[in-house]
Design a protein with these regions (language model features):
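Alpha-helical transmembrane segments of multi-pass small-molecule/ion transporters
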Residues: 1-335
Length: 335
């Protein structure tokens, strides 16, 4: 596992668990209407997060991988077509053993865009096509602002969870798209500053994610959503997440073989097409599921999937890098 990924696993995953424990110990503190005023803090935090995302998003960095349209099409189909269909199939099969909130959680997981940081990092470790990974992970994040609520409407009915689709899209435009556009407009002035302080901005972003997880679970504990659930719930979610991860990885491998991808494109496809963004998932949940008392339960499949994709990806990436290096050395020796 590479050093950046190891550091991310070392502190962030236990921190997520710690946020859940804190919510369980004193849910009234971080619940809606509590002393932390989370309903205001989260709205401001979400808008700041997407402003920073727009500020750090460099479209110039995408040009290196922009022309590989077969890779782009395969990744986006994996993220926004194969993944949602696989998740819908899992939910239909496991429906007798899942509550409505948990079914919605898996649908929500499957509708999310790919993650940027770990997709690109793992692709680099595995000696894959990094420009292609950067392009597709970034494109996926942009498309997700629109496609995620649309998939929720089609598969699970976000209208039933919050209101109507129109109001959800309005909230997304107001709290996500507008701040991101403002951040992009400020890049000529603040872009260099953001690049110098990228590590601090990423740390702030992760702290915001932890706060959003904490507040979501506070609401769930305050409404006694967890009453009647046991540790077997975590086991079931872990199994379901593992099944989805395996299905997507094998599907991406099959597509890569079908299209005749080389090692670089194959690695980028697998890592970008099989991953889901915890950051955007938690932040968008505060917009799409603002009035959902079981938001903590809805986010649980995403949190477990996030841990799974980091751990398994961290194991696979160096092995694939070694295999690619051995193959290159063998070809060089024959030549």
């Amino acid at each position: 596992m590479s050093a950046p990924l190891k550091r991310r696993v070392d502190w962030f995953l236990p921190a997520m668990a710690g946020a859940v424990v804190l919510a369980a110990l004193a849910p009234a503190v971080g619940a809606t209407g509590g002393p932390l005023h989370v309903e205001t803090v989260t709205k401001v935090g979400v808008m700041i997060a997407f402003f920073v995302y727009g500020l750090t998003l460099s479209f110039a960095a995408l040009t290196g991988g922009a022309m590989n349209w077969r890779l782009h099409l395969a990744v986006q189909m994996g993220t926004f077509l194969i993944f949602p269909i696989a998740g819908f199939g899992l939910v239909k099969v496991a429906a007798p053993w899942m509550s409505a909130d948990l079914r919605f959680g898996f649908i929500y997981l499957c509708a999310l865009p790919s993650t940027i940081s770990s997709s690109v990092a793992l692709t680099a470790v595995a000696r894959g096509n990094v420009p292609g990974a950067v392009f597709n992970a970034t494109l996926s994040s942009l498309l997700g602002v629109v496609l995620t609520p649309l998939w929720l409407y089609v598969l699970a009915g976000v209208a039933g969870a919050q209101g109507d689709l129109g109001s959800s899209i309005f909230d997304i435009a107001r709290m996500l798209v507008l701040p991101m556009a403002l951040g992009q407009l400020c890049r000529p002035v603040l872009g260099a500053w953001a690049a110098r302080h990228r590590a601090k901005l990423q740390l702030t972003d992760r702290c915001l994610i932890l706060f959003l997880i904490y507040s979501s679970f506070c609401d769930s504990f305050a409404h006694k959503i967890w009453a009647g659930h046991s540790l077997t719930l975590l086991g079931g979610i872990t199994v379901g997440s593992g099944v989805l991860f395996a299905v997507l990885v094998f599907a991406m491998v099959g597509i890569a073989r079908l299209l005749g991808f080389d090692h670089g494109d194959r690695v980028a496809l697998i890592f970008c097409g099989s991953k889901k963004s915890l950051a955007q998932g938690v932040i968008m949940a505060k917009v799409l599921l603002a009035a959902h008392p079981a938001a903590g339960l809805v986010l649980l499949p995403l949190m477990i999937y996030h841990a799974l994709q980091l751990v398994v990806g961290g194991i696979l990436a160096p092995r694939w890098a070694s295999a690619a290096l051995e193959k290159a050395n063998a070809q060089a020796s024959r030549g």
